Amino acid sequence: MAGTVAVPEGITNPPIDELLKVCDNKYALVIYAAKRARQINAYYAQLGEGLLEYVGPLVETYPTEKPLSIALREINAGLLTAEPIEQ
């Protein structure tokens, strides 16, 4: 039966295998995406105040899209760079 199937977004799109090509391991990917998602969330929160301290989303977004989904798509598109921190 032919029907319409929703295109998966967020955690399932982009696939984890593609995202792991960008980061060394899945734990680094989680930290990387979470930090960027916090920046995106802070950007949306400060829009009403007129402050522009954080950079907004670098990819096209949808009104109901979560900051983590946006961050994962930015990472997959190669729009962000992460540098390891020496301890």
UniProtKB/Swiss-Prot annotation:
Question: Which superkingdom?
Answer: Bacteria
Identify the keywords attached in UniProt to this record, alphabetized: DNA-directed RNA polymerase, Nucleotidyltransferase, Transcription, Transferase
Please tell me one Gene Ontology term that the record gives under cellular component: DNA-directed RNA polymerase complex
Supply the SUPFAM superfamilies for this chain.
RPB6/omega subunit-like
Q: Which top-level enzyme class is recorded in the Swiss-Prot or TrEMBL entry?
A: transferase
What Gene3D superfamilies is this protein classified in? Answer: 3.90.940.10
- Reaction catalyzed: RNA(n) + a ribonucleoside 5'-triphosphate = RNA(n+1) + diphosphate
The Enzyme Commission number assigned here is 2.7.7.6
Instruction: Name the InterPro entries on file.
Output: DNA-dir_RNA_pol_omega, Pol_omega/Rpo6/RPB6, RPB6/omega-like_sf
- GO terms (BP aspect): DNA-templated transcription
What Gene Ontology molecular-function terms does this entry list? DNA binding; DNA-directed RNA polymerase activity
Assembly information from the UniProt record? The RNAP catalytic core consists of 2 alpha, 1 beta, 1 beta' and 1 omega subunit. When a sigma factor is associated with the core the holoenzyme is formed, which can initiate transcription.
Of which family is this protein a member? Belongs to the RNA polymerase subunit omega family.
Give the function comment from the record: Promotes RNA polymerase assembly. Latches the N- and C-terminal regions of the beta' subunit thereby facilitating its interaction with the beta and alpha subunits.
Protein name in the entry: DNA-directed RNA polymerase subunit omega
This chain is encoded by the gene named rpoZ
